[in-house]
UniProtKB/Swiss-Prot annotation:
InterPro entries: Ribosomal_bL34, Ribosomal_bL34_CS. It comes from Geobacillus kaustophilus (strain HTA426). The lineage of its organism: Bacteria, Bacillati, Bacillota, Bacilli, Bacillales. One of its GO terms (biological process) is translation. Keywords: Ribonucleoprotein, Ribosomal protein. This is Large ribosomal subunit protein bL34. Signal peptide: none annotated. Residues 1-44 are annotated as: Disordered.
Length: 44
């Protein structure tokens, strides 16, 4: 059985990246939440 995590930089940024977050309203909410919490890294 193969492992579930198969790293792929392009897919990672497409799904969890900053521009992906900014492209939807809920994604912007995620970023706002993380800013409010004081996260050093906002997105992948």
């Amino acid at each position: 059985m193969k492992r579930t995590y198969q790293p792929n930089r392009r897919k990672r940024s497409k799904v969890h990246g900053f521009r992906a977050r900014m492209s939807t309203r809920n994604g912007r909410k995620v970023l706002a939440r993380r800013r409010r919490k004081g996260r050093k890294v906002l997105s992948a």
